[in-house]
C-alpha cells in the first residue's frame, strides 16, 4: 500500500474507479489523478468486463500504484463499486476515495478532502466533492441532498451538511465501511450511491466540501427521468424505480408519499410527451411494484480479511 505525506501525518488512502467500455475516459481520469497535490493515491481499477481494450491500456500504463481487477462480467455500477470498495478496504487502506471513470478531479481535490478530514478529526460518515459539468456549471446529476427530498441549496462556506451524495468523488474511512457494510450490489445501477450515503448519514454527520472540485464529464447530463430520456435508455429505468422503493421506504410514511408522488409525476410527464406511453408507464410501475417485493441484503466486509 502506498503511503503519502499529507501535512505532518502519514496516511494510507486508496482510490476506487469503476469503468466499463470507456477506455479514453479512464485514461483522462488516471491522468488527472497523477496531478494531485496530495500525491498519487493507490489505485483500484474495477473493470466490468470491458471489451474496448481497457485491460490492454492498463497493462501499457504499468503504473506501480495501480491494481486492476476484471469482474468477468458487467456487474453494473453498484456491483463494481461494492467490489472495488471491498478490495480497497480489505487491503489496509485507511481512506477510500470513490469515483466514476468519467470524473476528472482538480489538482487539489484530494488535498481539500484530507484537510476537511483533519479539521473534523474524523468525526463524519463521508465527505463529498462539488461536481461540475465541463462548462463549469454545477452538474445537475450530482447535486447532493440536504434532506432525502431536497437538493443542497448552497455551496457556501468550508462545508455543508448533507444526507445523500453520488459516487462522483466520495471520500470515507475504511472504518466506516466496516461499520455500515458495502453498497448493495443487487441494485446493478442507479440509487446505489444514494442508498449507501443515506445509510451512513442516518447515524453520522456527513458533509459536502465545496473547495474539493471535480469535473464530471458524463455523456448524459440530464436529470434521471424516463419522460425525457432517449428510447435506448428506457429499459434500464426498471432499476431506478425499483431501487428507489428500497431507498425511500426507510424514511417511513413520508418516504412512501414522496415516492408515489414522484412516480405519479413522472407518469404525468410521460402522458404529456413522446411516443410509446404505455411502454414507459409499464416500466415505471412494474419497477415500483418490483421494489415493494425487493429486499436485498447488505453485505459486510469479510471477517477474515479485516
Report the location of each language-model feature:
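A conserved acidic beta->alpha catalytic loop
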Residues: 32, 47-56, 73, 103-104
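Conserved donor NDP-sugar-binding/catalytic core segment of glycosyltransferases
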Residues: 108-141
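A short, conserved alpha-helix in the catalytic core of glycosyltransferases
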Residues: 170, 176-181, 186-212
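Single conserved hydrophobic/aromatic residue that forms the stacking wall/gate
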Residues: 1-12
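Short beta-strand-to-loop acidic/aromatic patch adjacent to the donor-nucleotide binding site
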Residues: 93-102
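Non-catalytic, C-terminal membrane-associated alpha-helical segments of glycosyltransferases
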Residues: 252-306
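Short, acidic, metal-binding catalytic loop of nucleotide-sugar glycosyltransferases
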Residues: 31-40
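Glycine-rich, basic loop-to-helix element that forms the pyrophosphate-binding segment
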Residues: 1, 71-91
Amino acid at each position: 500500500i502506498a503511503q503519502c505525506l499529507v501535512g505532518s501525518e502519514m496516511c494510507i488512502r486508496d482510490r476506487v474507479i469503476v469503468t466499463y467500455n470507456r477506455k479514453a475516459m479512464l485514461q483522462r481520469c488516471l491522468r488527472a489523478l497523477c496531478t494531485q497535490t496530495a500525491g498519487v493515491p493507490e489505485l483500484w481499477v474495477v473493470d466490468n468486463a470491458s471489451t474496448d481494450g481497457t485491460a490492454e491500456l492498463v497493462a501499457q500504463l504499468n503504473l506501480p500504484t495501480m491494481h486492476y481487477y476484471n469482474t468477468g462480467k458487467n456487474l453494473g455500477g453498484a456491483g463494481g463499486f461494492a467490489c472495488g470498495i471491498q478490495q480497497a478496504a480489505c487491503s489496509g487502506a485507511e481512506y477510500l476515495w470513490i469515483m466514476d471513470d468519467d470524473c476528472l478531479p482538480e489538482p487539489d481535490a484530494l488535498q481539500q478532502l484530507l484537510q476537511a478530514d483533519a479539521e473534523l478529526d474524523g468525526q463524519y460518515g463521508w465527505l463529498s466533492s462539488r461536481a461540475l459539468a465541463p462548462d463549469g456549471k454545477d452538474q445537475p446529476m450530482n447535486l447532493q441532498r440536504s434532506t432525502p427530498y431536497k437538493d443542497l441549496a448552497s455551496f457556501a462556506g468550508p462545508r455543508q451538511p448533507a444526507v445523500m451524495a453520488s459516487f462522483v468523488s466520495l471520500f470515507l474511512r475504511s472504518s466506516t465501511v466496516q461499520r455500515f457494510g458495502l453498497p448493495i450490489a443487487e441494485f446493478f445501477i442507479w440509487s446505489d450511491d444514494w442508498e449507501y450515503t443515506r445509510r451512513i448519514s442516518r447515524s453520522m454527520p456527513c458533509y459536502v466540501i465545496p473547495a474539493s472540485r471535480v469535473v464530471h464529464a458524463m455523456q448524459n447530463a440530464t436529470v434521471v427521468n424516463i419522460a425525457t430520456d432517449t428510447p435506448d435508455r428506457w429499459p434500464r429505468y426498471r432499476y431506478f424505480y425499483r431501487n428507489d422503493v428500497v431507498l425511500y421506504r426507510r424514511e417511513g410514511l413520508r418516504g412512501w408519499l414522496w415516492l408515489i408522488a414522484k412516480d405519479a409525476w413522472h407518469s404525468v410527464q410521460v402522458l404529456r410527451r413522446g411516443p410509446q406511453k404505455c411502454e414507459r408507464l409499464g416500466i415505471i410501475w412494474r419497477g415500483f411494484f418490483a421494489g415493494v417485493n425487493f429486499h436485498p441484503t447488505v453485505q459486510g466486509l469479510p471477517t477474515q480479511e479485516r
